[in-house]
Amino acid sequence: MINIKPLSVNKAWQGRRFKTKEYKVYETELSALLPPLNVPNGKIRIDVTFHFKNSLSDIDNPLKPFLDILQKKYGFNDRDVYELNVKKQVGEDGIEFNIYQL
């Protein structure tokens, strides 16, 4: 598990064009925490579990920023994602994920 609080999409962009300072810090921290990984070529499936301290957190808000950072770190294109499984768990903040070839 990556021990970082998932960032809400609401805190990622100012207006429609500019990444917030909070997003840039999150991107730097998350990128440093992501493990080395070889992403398979072609169609892929991504499984993600977001762990939140608060049960009221929305499951979909951290998804876009997280996927964008994964793409940047691992060099794949989101058009190659054919399956996406997202789960929410309540506990300590964190993110678990796996990427599989289909």
Q: Model-predicted segments: where are they?
A:
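Acidic, proline/glycine-enriched N-terminal capping motif
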Residues: M1-L102
